[in-house]
């Protein structure tokens, strides 16, 4: 039997395979949608630079055949900001997770959005710390179980997409691993947006979140995400009681505004007239 090869294998470092992800993990689905979105956006793969922090999702760039930075916990957006300011011609993509981005990296997240620097941040939200043993994260639903919450989480979770929208990101969307086509389309829009783009990919972690919350099967978890989701356009017309406990998906912001690199280089050019000298370091000649 002839087996057709995945067309996106050309973007992977095959010598790094097999990957470390657990069976049923959603990270592979999200990476696949990234490649699809990148091709849909017409972005040159050679212009991609990936940045990540610490966590399961942050291991993704190591498998991709592009320049990448594997940085310290919670700091990928800070590193990515420096990279983008130094070389604005790059398409800088951040892969991060709910713990990396919303806990130790929370301030970098909101200030990156506020500054509207041209980064595409893909946050894989599985509502738990997967790499370190199943601890509760800032997005764990109230009442969910984890290593640090044997009697259930007592704290209200962050709504990451609403948080980043309120902080000023010019493009924000949330989908799940069970919505790959929509996710790929939002990644395309994020890559084409000149500004801070935040794409939240709600994903399954069967090893820790699933096992500790009586959803052992990845299929069961994906079915739950699919059936428990409601589009934001529809949710905004419903009473709060009707959407309680639902996963709100869709676009949260699509409002272009001036981008940080453009502002900084514009100011330099206006005040000194030396913008060509500064940018010459990144020219082929």
Curated annotation (Swiss-Prot):
E.C. designation(s): 1.2.7.3
In what way does activity depend on pH? Optimum pH is 9.
What cystine pairs are annotated? none
Q: Which CDD domains match?
A: TPP_OGFOR (cd03375)
Q: What class of enzyme is it?
A: oxidoreductase
A molecular function annotated in GO for this UniProt entry is: thiamine pyrophosphate binding
Q: Which SUPFAM superfamilies does this entry report, sorted A to Z?
A: Thiamin diphosphate-binding fold (THDP-binding)
Give the temperature dependence: Optimum temperature is 70 degrees Celsius.
Q: Which reaction does it catalyse?
A: 2 oxidized [2Fe-2S]-[ferredoxin] + 2-oxoglutarate + CoA = succinyl-CoA + 2 reduced [2Fe-2S]-[ferredoxin] + CO2 + H(+)
Keyword vocabulary terms for this entry: Oxidoreductase
- Pfam families documented for this protein: TPP_enzyme_C (PF02775)
Q: Name one GO biological process term.
A: organic acid metabolic process
Subunit info here reads: Heterotetramer of the KorA, KorB, KorC and KorD subunits.
Name the UniProt record assigns to this protein: 2-oxoglutarate synthase subunit KorB
Question: What's the source species for this entry?
Answer: Methanothermobacter marburgensis (strain ATCC BAA-927 / DSM 2133 / JCM 14651 / NBRC 100331 / OCM 82 / Marburg) (Methanobacterium thermoautotrophicum)
């Amino acid at each position: 039997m002839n087996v057709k090869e995945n067309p996106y294998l050309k973007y992977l470092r095959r010598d790094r395979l097999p990957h470390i992800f657990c069976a049923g993990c959603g990270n592979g689905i999200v990476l696949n949608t990234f490649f699809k979105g990148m091709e849909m956006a017409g972005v040159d793969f050679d212009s991609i630079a990936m940045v990540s922090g610490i966590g399961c999702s942050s291991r993704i760039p190591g498998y991709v055949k592009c320049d990448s930075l594997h940085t310290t916990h919670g700091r990928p957006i800070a590193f990515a900001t420096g990279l983008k300011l130094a070389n604005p011609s790059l398409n800088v993509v951040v892969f991060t997770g709910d713990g990396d981005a919303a806990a130790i990296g929370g301030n970098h997240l909101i200030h990156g959005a506020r500054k509207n620097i041209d980064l595409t941040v893909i946050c894989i939200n599985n509502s738990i710390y997967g790499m370190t043993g199943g601890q509760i994260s800032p997005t764990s639903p109230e009442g969910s179980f984890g290593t640090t919450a044997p009697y259930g989480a007592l704290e209200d979770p962050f709504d990451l997409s609403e948080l980043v929208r309120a902080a000023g990101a010019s493009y924000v969307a949330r989908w799940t691993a069970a919505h790959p086509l929509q996710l790929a389309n939002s990644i395309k829009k994020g890559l084409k947006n000149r500004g801070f783009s935040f794409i939240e990919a709600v994903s399954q972690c069967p090893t820790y979140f699933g096992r500790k919350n009586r959803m052992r099967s990845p299929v069961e978890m994906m079915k739950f995400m699919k059936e428990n989701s409601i589009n934001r356009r529809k949710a905004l017309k419903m009473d709060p009681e009707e959407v309680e406990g639902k996963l709100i998906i869709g676009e949260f912001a699509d409002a272009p505004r001036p981008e940080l690199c453009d502002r900084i280089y514009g100011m330099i050019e206006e005040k000194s007239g030396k913008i060509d000298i500064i940018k010459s370091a990144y020219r082929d000649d």
